[in-house]
Every structure is written in structure tokens, then in C-alpha cells.
């Protein structure tokens, strides 16, 4: 079986994180911002799992990955609830309008 070098995992994780950070910085749609955050968290998960491939007897990478997945699920649930409430009030999904929370 062919083993994939650790550098490939890290390059893919860096590209995912870069795409997520560019999406977070440049886009104004709240749902796209949440998806960009999720993409960055998945890049971190990939890095942690790659760490676990280098150190197979240390399960810290997998344990931290489970914590990050749990935090990402909570962040997605709370974030989507806030976006839905904001959309019901303002009828828009633009993050520029989020500073106008008072009516």
C-alpha cells in the first residue's frame, strides 16, 4: 500500500484554510461566512489527523478533532439560529447590515 506523505496533508489543509479565510474576509453573506468558518475548522481537523499519522501511538490528534467537531456543530447551530432570526427581522443576509440591530 502506498503511503501518502504528511506534507500533502498539510498542503491540502493550508489550501482549505486559505480558501476559508479568503471567503470569510471577502464575502458579505452571513451563510457564506458560516461556511467559511466551517471550512477553516475542517482544515484544522485535517492537520490534527495528519499529526496523528506521524505519531500513531499518541491519540491526541483524534481527541482534539472530536472536540473541534463538537464545537463546530454547536457553532453551526447557534450561528444558523442567529442568521435566521436576523433574516426574519431585516429580510437580508448581508453582514454589513448586522450593525443596525436596532429598529
From Swiss-Prot:
EC number(s) reported in the record: 7.1.1.-
Protein location: Cell inner membrane
GO biological process: ATP synthesis coupled electron transport
Record-annotated membrane-spanning stretches: 6-26, 30-50, 66-86
Membrane topology, record value: Multi-pass membrane protein
Pfam annotation, one family: Oxidored_q2
Cited NCBIfam families: PRK05715.1-2 (NF004320), PRK05715.1-3 (NF004321), PRK05715.1-5 (NF004323)
Subunit: NDH-1 is composed of 14 different subunits. Subunits NuoA, H, J, K, L, M, N constitute the membrane sector of the complex.
Protein name, UniProt field: NADH-quinone oxidoreductase subunit K
Lineage per the UniProt record: Bacteria, Pseudomonadati, Myxococcota, Polyangia, Polyangiales
Name of the gene encoding the protein in the UniProt record: nuoK
Amino acid at each position: 500500500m502506498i503511503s501518502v506523505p504528511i506534507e500533502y496533508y498539510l498542503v491540502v489543509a493550508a489550501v482549505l484554510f486559505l480558501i476559508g479565510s479568503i471567503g470569510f474576509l471577502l464575502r458579505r453573506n452571513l451563510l457564506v461566512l458560516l461556511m467559511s468558518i466551517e471550512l477553516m475548522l475542517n482544515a484544522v481537523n485535517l492537520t490534527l489527523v495528519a499529526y496523528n499519522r506521524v505519531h500513531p501511538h499518541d491519540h491526541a490528534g483524534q481527541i482534539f478533532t472530536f472536540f473541534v467537531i463538537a464545537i463546530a456543530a454547536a457553532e453551526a447551530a447557534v450561528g444558523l439560529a442567529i442568521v435566521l432570526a436576523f433574516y426574519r427581522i431585516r429580510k437580508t443576509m448581508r453582514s454589513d447590515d448586522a450593525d443596525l440591530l436596532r429598529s
